[in-house]
Amino acid sequence: MRLYFRKLWLTNLFLGGALASSAAIGAVSPKTYKDADFYVAPTQQDVNYDLVDDFGANGNDTSDDSNALQRAINAISRKPNGGTLLIPNGTYHFLGIQMKSNVHIRVESDVIIKPTWNGDGKNHRLFEVGVNNIVRNFSFQGLGNGFLVDFKDSRDKNLAVFKLGDVRNYKISNFTIDDNKTIFASILVDVTERNGRLHWSRNGIIERIKQNNALFGYGLIQTYGADNILFRNLHSEGGIALRMETDNLLMKNYKQGGIRNIFADNIRCSKGLAAVMFGPHFMKNGDVQVTNVSSVSCGSAVRSDSGFVELFSPTDEVHTRQSWKQAVESKLGRGCAQTPYARGNGGTRWAARVTQKDACLDKAKLEYGIEPGSFGTVKVFDVTARFGYNADLKQDQLDYFSTSNPMCKRVCLPTKEQWSKQGQIYIGPSLAAVIDTTPETSKYDYDVKTFNVKRINFPVNSHKTIDTNTESSRVCNYYGMSECSSSRWER
């Protein structure tokens, strides 16, 4: 990937520099848009219901309120023009709610929504939209200062707030999520399988949402399949706020999905990996425009990963790590398979990434019909990264401290009690404003054009950008450094 900077390009404000806004730069400015380009509110409705008064929910106990909410949704959706449901102030418990067409939910500002305990070990979502049925014209919005989704006391780590599938013309807005380091992004903009093809969301707005205490590898939103969506005013503490990482294996099998015509504005990260991430994996994605990105004590503000090809051993064959590597190289050539890693099936299924060389990737495309993913035109305007000491960092990123932090100061390793898979994540100083690990010389590269990037309070010898040409070497003892205190781990 090649990062483009107009006029000066990453001035460190700590050293007294200053940058003009992207509008002042002159040559390039963001596309304009209006809300109605993404979501159109209803002009006529048949009913207005209250969840407590009309359907008997109780916001003052610990009982499951899912049945009452589902009955209300069903009743509204049966009306030709649908209607609005008010969730009045109180504490409610929901799980597995199926949203339907023409239902518009409004939630008062003192509402607390908690997950109903299930305990079956499966993945759970509070609300599913267009997963099992087509949904058209839907909204779920907080009133006033917004409501709270509270996961803090839940023992269920397999939770998400929303999963979106085949939904069109929708708006989700105005609430806070108190997470408990669950192992999903809180809003999954996903795909769903029906009648031999995949379906995904089109025409929507997701905005005014803050997430606290997210797990490093997840965060607020992940997009798999989406067309014409506006993401606005989003903030994730921990992980990634807007993770455009299109890695759903259903999409790989169908060769369908991906994201196109995406707009984002005011995307923020604190104490996490990044505010915005591009990770195409194996999908050909379309155009993306992002404006006003900021990070405080994050690894970076913007992160871009290369697309790649990954080959899985067949489920009906038994392989070792070495035998699957040899099988791939017998098709693609020596040196074209990286070391495989286990992917289930009793420890006998393996995945091997194809080496990031055009000759190897060309053979993989010819042999398997798969090539690295990419994006279309990507422009990111007005990026501000503020240095801090509590960023989420991946193990391979620690090597970039070779010039800026060679003693690996203030980097800690979570204890096994905090995170059992030691070596996956660390907490330490911010690295750069932009991290770009895509190959510059490959024809499978994609470009991110970035305008007006600022760094605040970064040390003098820190990196401006990190890319494939950045010097790196191992300076941290990956497993011998100090343990993270509970205050650093728990935010």
From Swiss-Prot:
Enzyme class: hydrolase
EC number: 3.2.1.157
InterPro entries: Pectin_lyas_fold, Pectin_lyase_fold/virulence, RHGA/B-epi-like_pectate_lyase
Signal peptide segment: 1-23
Main localization category: secreted
The keyword Ligase appears for this protein: no
Keywords for this protein: Carbohydrate metabolism, Cell wall biogenesis/degradation, Disulfide bond, Glycosidase, Hydrolase, Polysaccharide degradation, Secreted, Signal
Disulfide bonds: C269-C298, C336-C360, C408-C476, C412-C484
Compartment(s) where it occurs, according to its Swiss-Prot or TrEMBL record: Secreted
GO terms for MF: iota-carrageenase activity
Any one GO cellular component localisation term in the record: extracellular region
Keyword Hydrolase: yes
Gene3D superfamilies named in the record: Single-stranded right-handed beta-helix, Pectin lyase-like
GO biological process: cell wall organization; polysaccharide catabolic process
Catalytic activity: Endohydrolysis of 1,4-beta-D-linkages between D-galactose 4-sulfate and 3,6-anhydro-D-galactose-2-sulfate in iota-carrageenans
Coiled coil ranges: none
SUPFAM superfamilies reported for this sequence: Pectin lyase-like
Similarity annotation: Belongs to the glycosyl hydrolase 82 family.
Task of the protein: Hydrolyzes iota-carrageenans, sulfated 1,3-alpha-1,4-beta galactans from red algal cell walls, with an inversion of anomeric configuration. Also active against hybrid iota-/nu-carrageenan, not active against kappa- or lambda-carrageenans.
Protein name: Iota-carrageenase
Organism expressing this protein natively: Alteromonas macleodii
Gene name of the encoded protein: cgiA
